[in-house]
Structure formats: structure tokens, C-alpha cells
Amino acid sequence: MASYRLLLLCLAGLVFVSEAGPAGAGESKCPLMVKVLDAVRGSPAVNVGVKVFKKAADGTWEPFALGKTSEFGELHGLTTDEKFVEGIYKVELDTKSYWKALGISPFHEYAEVVFTANDSGRRHYTIAALLSPYSYSTTALVSSPKEGAL
């Protein structure tokens, strides 16, 4: 029964993450956006450090972009369509610092998502994460850029 409740909480959180945010956030012109929700408090995760890396031809990870989530738990403007070319990317969320700032000792040092972008044509990606001190889950919302949004 406890696992069922946890599953429902996670699903509800992911719905919140995909729909929460300021008016017009769904119309974002950003080709890569990050949304983070605190599952413990049921609110956006504010000031989460985000680092994005791009995999180089030699297999190393090169820094690509960085920032922190806003009061809405979102990070826009990480890159442009011109710079966000086909490739393998890694998004790393500094979950340890987030939980430590709240006085909680977390299990994970960070949460990461590794994905291939734009291999099927130009797309916009929203990486959504649901955080708790001992677990995290992620999902991606992938869409075609809207006409006139480029």
C-alpha cells in the first residue's frame, strides 16, 4: 500500500511539473528547458544548480551551459537553437546542495539525465525532475518547435 501511495505521489508530481509555471511557459522558445519539483514539499524546487554537458567525439563531457532554477523551479535560456545541435547531452542537477540548504541530509550527490538530442530533426526538450532526499525520477517532454517561435 505504501508503494502505491508513493507511485501516486510521483505521478501527481510529474503532472504538476509538466503543467506548473508562469503563464506562457509552455510557449517557451528555449530548445532546452529544465523543470524541478520538490516532492517532499509539493512545490517548485528553487535555486537548484543545473549543469549541462555535451559529449565530445573523444567521449569526454564538455561544459555546455549552467544556471539555477527560478522561483517556479524552471530554468529557461540555457542555449539557442543554433548552438543546440544533434548530439548526446547530460543534464546534472545539484540535488545535494538543494537538500542541504533545507537542513536535510540526502542520499544522492546529484541527479543526472543523459539523452540524445535532435537526432530526428530539430526538437525542443523539457527535462522534468521530481526530487526527494532519497530518490528522484525524471521524464522528458519532447516537441517540435512552434511556428514563429524560432
Curated annotation (Swiss-Prot):
Cellular component, GO annotation: extracellular space
One Pfam family hit: Transthyretin
Location(s) in or outside the cell: Secreted
Gene3D superfamilies named in the record: Transthyretin/hydroxyisourate hydrolase domain
Keywords in alphabetical order: Gamma-carboxyglutamic acid, Glycoprotein, Hormone, Secreted, Signal, Sulfation, Thyroid hormone, Transport
Glycosylation site list: 118
SMART domains, sorted: TR_THY
Residues the record lists as Sulfocysteine modifications: 30
Positions of post-translational 4-carboxyglutamate modification: 62
Residues that coordinate or bind L-thyroxine: 35, 74, 137
Tissue: Detected in plasma and cerebrospinal fluid (at protein level). Highly expressed in the choroid plexus. Detected in liver.
UniProt GO molecular function: hormone activity; small molecule binding; thyroid hormone binding
Signal peptide residue numbers: 1-20
Processing after translation: Sulfonation of the reactive cysteine Cys-30 enhances the stability of the native conformation of TTR, avoiding misassembly of the protein leading to amyloid formation.
Biological process annotations from GO: purine nucleobase metabolic process
Main location group: secreted
Disulfide bonds: none
Recorded superkingdom: Eukaryota
Functional summary from the UniProt entry: Thyroid hormone-binding protein. Probably transports thyroxine from the bloodstream to the brain.
Family, as annotated: Belongs to the transthyretin family.
UniProt subunit comment: Homotetramer. Dimer of dimers. In the homotetramer, subunits assemble around a central channel that can accommodate two ligand molecules. Interacts with RBP4.
Name of the protein in question: Transthyretin
Species of the source: Sus scrofa
